[in-house]
Regions:
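N-terminal entrance/gating region of PLP-dependent enzymes' catalytic architecture
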Residues: 1-131, 421, 443, 454-455
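Short Gly/Ser/Thr- and Asp/Glu-enriched loop/turn motifs at secondary-structure junctions
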Residues: 130-131, 168, 390-396, 427-433
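A short linear hydrophobic-aromatic micro-motif
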Residues: 132, 385-389, 420-425
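Conserved PLP-enzyme active-site core in the AAT-like
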Residues: 139, 143-314
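Active-site C-terminal subdomain of aminotransferase-like
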Residues: 236, 255, 280-382
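Conserved PLP-binding catalytic core of the aspartate aminotransferase-like
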Residues: 388-415
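Short amphipathic alpha-helices in soluble, non-transmembrane regions
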Residues: 408-416, 449-456
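PLP-dependent enzyme catalytic core of the Aspartate aminotransferase-like
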Residues: 428-470
Length: 470
């Protein structure tokens, strides 16, 4: 395949993409397949000779779309969204064509400088004060890992980088049980050890309070342990919990501890000023992460980390061997020194396209619609016999259940097998619940209202096949 063939096939691919998105409502959201079904359709060995693109394209159409769970489906209410707005898809086509590695300024000046400006545009959009700068990671997992590594080095007086962790004191980090599992992964990868991640008890709203955090830190200091950092939750993955950020930041500052706020999902909603009280006090944090690829339409992967003191993270992660130096350019930013990977994609272009193509007003309206529709869906589900709302909507996320875990699990299975909507599960105080999050970029009100209709039909069908009891 040469570049002239690329011209032809790119047009076909663009047509296919538009048709695919237009057809999503007619497809089941989740692939109705058993494990191994796709692999069995592929030959066991690679071809020795080139195959015509017509054959490759035909195989793609025959195998791939029906083997996918459709994350862009308007009725994808599972997990959190991974939205791809049309403007984002267009930008990614251009990025793929240029195929750059934006590891340092010299390798891609436009990628570096657009990233700097886009991060600042987002800072302004979220209402964060001047003084925060930042970078774009692939995921919140790597952003949190970067923050944890920096906290570790601060606590060790920057000795861990040279001397390793052998003989170093056990460092203690603090978070609530509502924080994402990526926090646990960061703690493990950073060599802190799972048992040194203190899960601070939460209040009735599932929030870590300043008082609870202060008590946990005091207990560790009394035991001769070394507190190193605090990780706060702003919109937990399970049911949308928010820690008392202002109170916890104040405690951390009084204790001399840095703070990192995980707002991977909910951070996007903060472009709407009315939602900002949920993360009040965030301006006092040292590090904040949110994912535009979840709710702003800048497709995966695109995770923005804001930093008050990038120098500390650069000191932790940055290396500048001779072969990566840019002569006479000491004032430039090399973003590979801010992140764990050396190689970097040109992720900022899709932000530039999305923010301009929809504007903050357009993006705000989508988020406000999603929140409003989630509340309406909650009310309709609450009116169904046997359905209990377990957690009330936090932004566009809530949960519900039936009387027993077994009945709830069976209902979830029926809903997802039906295919019109897709939901996933969590546990609240040990109870199995069904999560509902509204956030698809192309979702309409009627898509959300179909949720309660589907649940009602699945409950009614139980008369011919009862849901099991615990």
């Amino acid at each position: 395949m040469d570049h002239e063939a690329l011209r032809i096939w790119s047009k076909r691919a663009a047509d296919w993409a538009a048709d695919y998105h237009a057809s999503l409502r007619d497809r089941p959201v989740r692939a109705p397949l058993d494990p191994g079904a796709v692999a069995r359709k592929l030959p066991p060995s690679p071809p020795e000779t080139a195959e015509p693109m017509e054959r490759i394209w035909a195989d793609f159409q025959a195998i791939v779309p029906d083997g996918m769970t459709h994350w862009q489906h308007p009725r994808f209410f599972a997990y959190f969204p991974a939205n791809a707005a049309p403007a984002s898809m267009l930008a990614e086509q251009l990025v793929n064509a240029m195929a750059c590695n934006a590891l340092i300024w010299q390798t891609s000046p436009a990628a570096t400088e657009i990233e700097q400006v886009m991060v600042d545009w987002l800072r302004q959009a979220l209402g964060l004060p001047e003084g925060f700068v930042g970078t774009i990671h692939d995921s919140a997992t790597n952003a949190t890992l970067s923050a944890v590594l920096t906290m570790r080095e601060r606590a060790l007086g920057w000795r861990g980088l040279d001397e390793g962790l052998s003989g170093a004191p056990a460092l203690r980090f603090y978070a609530s049980a509502e924080t994402h599992s990526s926090v646990d992964k960061a703690i493990r990868v950073a060599g802190i050890g799972q048992r040194n991640l203190v899960k601070v008890p939460t209040d009735a709203t599932r929030a870590m309070t300043g008082a609870a955090l202060a008590a946990a830190i005091a207990a560790d200091r009394a035991a001769g342990l070394v507190p190193a950092g605090v990780i706060l939750c702003a919109g937990g993955t399970s049911v949308g919990a928010f820690d008392r950020i202002a109170d916890c930041v104040a405690v951390a500052q009084a204790e001399g501890l840095p703070t990192h706020v995980d707002a991977a999902w909910a951070g996007s909603a903060m472009i709407c000023p009315e939602f900002r009280p949920l993360w009040a006090g965030v301006e006092g944090a040292d590090s904040i992460v949110f994912n535009p690829h979840k709710w702003l339409g800048a497709q995966f992967d695109c995770s923005v980390q804001f930093l008050k003191d990038p120098g500390a993270q650069v000191r932790t992660l940055g290396l500048r061997p001779t072969y990566l130096e840019t002569a006479g350019r000491e004032e430039i930013v090399n973003f590979n020194e801010w992140t764990v990977p050396l190689g970097r994609r040109f992720r900022a272009l899709k932000l530039w396209f999305v923010l301009r193509a929809y504007g903050l007003d357009g993006l705000r309206q989508r988020i406000r619609d999603h929140v409003r529709w989630a509340v309406a869906a909650r009310d309709r589900l609450a009116a169904l016999p046997g359905v209990e709302i377990v957690t009330e909507p936090r932004l566009s996320l809530f949960s519900f259940a039936l009387e027993t875990d077994a009945a709830t699990e069976a209902l979830l299975q029926r809903i997802n097998d039906d295919g019109r909507v897709y939901l996933t599960q969590s546990r609240v105080d040990g109870r199995f619940v069904i999560r509902v999050q509204v956030g698809s970029f192309d979702c309409r009100e009627e898509d959300v209202m179909l949720l309660s209709k589907t649940v009602q039909e699945m409950l009614a069908s139980c008369s011919s096949g009862p849901l099991p009891s615990r």
